[in-house]
């Protein structure tokens, strides 16, 4: 294996060059930057010879490229707290070459580790519960009632939290850390960097930039093209944690004062991904019991499971109403429901666990032909129009063959 490597692709190493152009973003001094991004400090053991202050060519991290004395030190955690021995290291002990092509025991890395290459994040198991027998305890950061109220408002509409039960929600809220962003044009995460934290926006707006090269480049336009803006209640940073991949975009603050809440990688995977994994397993088991879907392959049912949303209705509440446009398909998970038609006093159909309704209004693009009301408290799995069209194609003919005389609900 060749020892040659490109330092520009390595998120842990910075090489200063005289040709680098100044950044269009504000430089943030190390002692006051409130740095919110970090390579995974715990991934590698400490090395007394590690490069800690080489100049950066990342315009969103180091400000003006080429100022090697002001580069980011990796001895701090994502919240600006010093964690290692890098800060007090004698400048004379730092390798003037700025990088080492390969690792080795002397450098604190494996012999075959190429420092010049971009590194991937160390992956946990895809099944977050696979290590559930250990003694992991979720972090807990005390919060005032006012902070909790603000935080609950911030996460109330976030899709990643919509399926958590009360205990899981409380664990996540306790683990979140408030992160004030004190100025405009502060880089929160950089494309291509390792991902350690997931962020929720409470206050302020943040622009999203993507560079086609896959990482931030030198120069005023090194962040790439702006593709969107994230506002209060939004979130970012989950993809790198979910898929153990480098950051997919650069996020920059746009207002003089903003507030984020940060959730660390381990808690994110243990709580949010564990919830998603268990939810998929639950739905897969449920879908296997639905006669309509018995002909589907396991991977097809898994796709449906990922697309379902759980909704609860109290007894007496209408799930769908006659005459309304058809926008979703429903599977009854628990409880009992009944279908009614205008002019008919008695229910025209009863439902129990495993039954479904709402399909023909989607198949034929017609209004609902009947109303469905919860007889008891019910829990339904809802599949939206797009997911229905995309995922239930293999059983469309089965649904169309069902006779209305024996199953009037198919017209709903």
UniProtKB/Swiss-Prot annotation:
SMART domains (UniProt xref): cNMP
PROSITE patterns: CNMP_BINDING_1, CNMP_BINDING_2, CNMP_BINDING_3
Chain segments carrying region Dimerization and phosphorylation: 23-159
InterPro entries: cAMP-dep_PK_reg_su-like, cAMP_dep_PK_reg_su, cNMP-bd_CS, cNMP-bd_dom, cNMP-bd_dom_sf, RmlC-like_jellyroll
Biased composition range(s): Polar residues: 1-11, 49-60, 119-138
Gene Ontology MF annotations: cAMP binding; cAMP-dependent protein kinase inhibitor activity; protein kinase A catalytic subunit binding
Binding residue positions for 3',5'-cyclic AMP 1: 160-291
Chain residue ranges for the region called Disordered: 1-146
One GO CC annotation: cytosol
One Pfam family from the record: cNMP_binding
Keywords carried by this UniProt record: cAMP, cAMP-binding, Nucleotide-binding, Phosphoprotein, Repeat
Single biological process term from Gene Ontology: adenylate cyclase-activating G protein-coupled receptor signaling pathway
Residue numbers of Phosphoserine PTMs: 120
Membrane-spanning intervals of the chain: none
Cysteines engaged in disulfide bonds, as pairs: none
Binding site for 3',5'-cyclic AMP 2: 292-405
Annotated Basic and acidic residues bias: 16-29
Subunit structure: Tetramer, composed of 2 regulatory (R) and 2 catalytic (C) subunits. In the presence of cAMP it dissociates into 2 active monomeric C subunits and an R dimer.
Family of this protein: Belongs to the cAMP-dependent kinase regulatory chain family.
Protein name: cAMP-dependent protein kinase regulatory subunit
Gene (UniProt): pkaR
């Amino acid at each position: 294996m060749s020892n040659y490597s490109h330092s520009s692709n390595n998120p842990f190493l910075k090489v200063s060059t005289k040709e680098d152009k100044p950044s269009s973003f504000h430089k943030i001094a190390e002692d006051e930057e409130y740095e919110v991004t970090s390579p995974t400090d715990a991934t590698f053991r400490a090395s007394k010879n590690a490069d800690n202050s080489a100049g950066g060519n990342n315009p969103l991290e180091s400000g003006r490229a080429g100022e090697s004395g002001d580069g980011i030190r990796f001895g701090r955690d994502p919240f600006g707290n010093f964690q290692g021995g890098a800060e007090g290291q004698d400048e004379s002990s730092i390798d003037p070459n700025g990088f080492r092509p390969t690792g080795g025991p002397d450098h604190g890395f494996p012999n075959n580790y190429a420092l010049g290459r971009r590194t991937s994040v160390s992956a946990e198991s895809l099944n977050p519960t696979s290590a559930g027998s250990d003694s992991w305890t979720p972090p807990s950061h005390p919060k005032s009632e006012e902070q909790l109220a603000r935080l609950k408002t911030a996460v109330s509409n976030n899709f990643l939290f919509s399926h958590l039960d009360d205990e899981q929600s409380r664990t996540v809220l306790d683990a979140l850390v408030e992160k004030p962003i004190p100025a405009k044009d502060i880089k929160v995460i950089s494309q291509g960097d390792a991902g350690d934290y997931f962020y929720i926006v409470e206050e302020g707006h943040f622009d999203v930039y993507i560079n086609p090269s896959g990482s931030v480049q030198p120069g005023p336009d090194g962040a790439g093209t702006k593709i969107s803006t994230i506002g209060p209640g939004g979130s970012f940073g989950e993809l790198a944690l979910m898929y153990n991949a480098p950051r997919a975009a650069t996020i920059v603050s746009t207002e003089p004062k903003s507030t984020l809440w940060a959730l660390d990688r381990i808690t994110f995977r243990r709580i949010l991904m564990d919830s998603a994994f268990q939810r998929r397993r639950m739905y897969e088991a449920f879908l296997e019991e639905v006669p309509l879907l018995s002909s589907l392959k396991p991977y097809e049912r898994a796709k449906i499971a990922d697309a379902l949303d759980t909704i609860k209705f109290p007894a007496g509440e209408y799930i769908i109403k006659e005459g309304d446009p058809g926008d979703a398909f429903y599977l009854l998970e628990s409880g009992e429901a009944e279908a009614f038609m205008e002019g008919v006093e008695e229910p025209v159909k009863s439902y129990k666990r495993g039954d479904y309704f709402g399909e023909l209004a989607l198949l034929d693009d017609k209004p609902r032909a009947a109303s469905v009301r919860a007889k008891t408290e019910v829990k339904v799995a809802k599949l939206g129009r797009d997911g229905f069209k995309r995922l239930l194609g293999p059983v469309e003919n089965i649904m169309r063959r069902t006779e209305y005389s024996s199953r009037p609900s198919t017209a709903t």
